[in-house]
Amino acid sequence: MKISTVVLSGILLTGCYETPEMVFDLTDEDDKWAFYNVGFPSDLRLLENGRPDLSEFPHRLLSPLVMEAAREAERYEGMTGYAPDTPVYIRFSGDYTAEDLGLGELPAYFAVDDAAIQLIDIDPDSALRGTRYPVDVDFRFEEDEYRPASLLEALPVGASQQENTTYAFIVTREIAGDYASELEPNKVLNYLLKGKNPRYVDWSVSSEAGAEALAVYAPLREQLALEGINPDDVVAAVVWTTGEPSKTAFRLGEVMQEWPLYPLQTEWHKTEDRPEYCAYEATWTVPGFQKGWLPYPMPLWGGDIDYSDDGTPIEQYQRTVTVGVTIPRTPMPAEGYPVMLFHHGTGGWTDNL
């Protein structure tokens, strides 16, 4: 996904149409692309339980898999907020063509504080507050089944975001290059970045929606003030908070380390004798915790794990599996052989190793 700053400025501001601006609608207007009306991800799209609201995600192909995946994401009890490194989408008004497309900038180009596009850690409690992250940027000119036209897309690459941290993605008027002074921010967004009630510029915004938006954008307002960035120079922005998806995995690991090791069901026996290594196999009974039917190809087939009140995973079944070990035909180093673990998961064969 790549498009250059120069290309964007040429496409957005060639003078054949109105100056484009970010679509930022707090009125819940009935729109087939309403999912993108405040950008994504956004803390404006969190439910009361802290999970993302994906109810307006477009299902134009009526794909059962996509629809069920969106519902599962809302229902997943182990996650609030957004996953680190979630792609970012900002919708712009207007229609554009791709006639001037050129080579894009490298993601690291945007990881500086004077870039026209910036992904920023804005969390007051973060040790990395103010850090810029590299992003791979694209601009979609035409709509498809799931995305509207005139959609700016950014994918974080090369550096992971932290869990339980608030981030902002901003686009400044410098995206327009020589036409920077002609680019205007969305008025509702501009008021939020200045700490003003957006109802002053759009009376259709409810008091509740205005207050929520002011609270969501407060960390970005503080960051802009801290760094001396003029809110009038920010033409698009989204703010979101990451969750803690690793918490469940770490908890599982801690619980399982306390369990006794299951014994082998058979003795080790040699299965291969090659010039480079020998291979041995045995069988082992292991517990299974996912409900449903292997290999869980769709959410309807299960794959969830139930937990007891103390957070212990509930065993659903046991099965016997083959365990394979390969040993190099070289003298073992004083510190031992290096170990690589290969776990196939949801099916597969031991000799895939």
What are these regions (language model features)?
Residues 1-9:
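Sec-dependent signal peptide recognition
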Residues 9-16:
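Hydrophobic h-region of N-terminal signal peptides that target proteins for export
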Residues 17-296:
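Acidic, low-complexity Ser/Thr/Gly/Pro-rich repeat segments typical of extracellular/periplasmic
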Residues 129, 209-216, 324-327, 342, ...:
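Unusually extended, aromatic-enriched hydrophobic runs near protein termini
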Residues 170, 177, 184, 326-353:
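Short, surface-exposed "cap/lid" segments of acyl-processing enzymes
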Residues 268-336:
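N-terminal cap/lid segment of alpha/beta-hydrolase-fold proteins
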